[in-house]
Amino acid sequence: MSTDSDHTHPIPPAFQEYDTQKLRQSPAFGHGKHGIADLVVGREDNKPTRLLSDFLRVPYHLSGTLDSDPVDELITVCLQDPTGAITQGDRHSLTVTARPDAYAHITNQSASKVQTMKASYAHLEATLIAESGAYLEYLPEPTILNEDARCLQTTTVEMAPDATVIVGDVFVPDGLSAHEPFSFDHYHSRTDARVEQRLICADAVNLQPAQRDPRNLATIGEYTVIGNLYVFSPGADVEAIAEMVHQRLTDHEGAAGVSTLRNEAGITVRALGDRSTDVTAAIEAAWDETRRELLGVGAPLGDR
C-alpha cells in the first residue's frame, strides 16, 4: 500500500484509485499544492518554550509565535494558509517535534474548506512527535467538505511514556453552500498513536455517503457534525480526567461520549451535533477540563 510521504499512514485503496485520475490543472504535489510545515519547539531549564526551527512551503505560512497562553512555559503556533481553500490534488503535510519538556499549542488561522472535486483527492497529514516530558496540543479549526469533495485526513502521534499529546478535530459536511447534507464523495480520517512504538490508539472515521448513508444508528444517526478529542497521557490519572470530562459534557447540545484507552494511556471524546458551533463547544469544553486536570489551568477559549 503506497504512502504520500515518509511519515503518513498507508493510503487506503479507494484513495490510491483516486490518485490515478489526471488533473487538468497543476498535478498533485505541483507548485502551490504540496504544502509542508516542519516545526521543532524546545525549552531550556525553566524558560518558556521557543520555536527552534521551521521549514515551510506554500501554502503554509507562519508570521511568528504567540505567548498569550495562561501557561507561562507554553508557546502557541498559528499556521496560516493564504489560498483560503483545499482543492483537488492538494497534499499538505505538517510535522511538529516537541523536544524534552517543551510545551506547545498548534492550531491554524481558519477552517480547512475542501472544495468540489472532479478528480484525485486532498490529503491533510499531521505527524506529532513528543519527547520526554513534552506537552503538545494540536487543535486545528474545523474541516469543511463541499459537494463531491474527497478528503483523506491522517494524524500520527509518536510519544514518550511521560509525554502528553492532545489532538482535536471537527468535521462539517457541506458547509460552504446549500447542497444536500452529505453530498461530498469521500471523507476518511484516521488517528494513530504510539508510545515507544507500542500502539495505544487507532481510530478512524470513513464516510462514503453514496455507498452508505452515514445517518444510521450505527454511524452518526440523526446528526451531521462530528467532533473528536484524543488525550494521550500515559502518566496521568486517566480515570479522573474521563470522569471530569463526562460531567462537563452532560448538558451538551447533541450527543457526546468519553472512553478510556487501554493500559490507561489516555481518553477519547466523540461529540455529535447539528451545528458546528455546538460540537466545537463540546470539544473545547473537554479540552478545557483536561487542561485543568493536567496543568491546573483551563484552556484559553476566549483567544481562539
Curated annotation (Swiss-Prot):
Q: How does it assemble?
A: UreD, UreF and UreG form a complex that acts as a GTP-hydrolysis-dependent molecular chaperone, activating the urease apoprotein by helping to assemble the nickel containing metallocenter of UreC. The UreE protein probably delivers the nickel.
The protein's organism comes out as Haloquadratum walsbyi (strain DSM 16790 / HBSQ001)
Q: GO MF terms on file?
A: nickel cation binding
Q: Where in the cell is it found?
A: Cytoplasm
Recorded protein name is Urease accessory protein UreD
Pfam families, per the entry = UreD
Source organism, top-level taxon: Archaea
GO CC, any one term? cytoplasm
Q: Which HAMAP family match?
A: UreD (MF_01384)
* Homology family: Belongs to the UreD family.
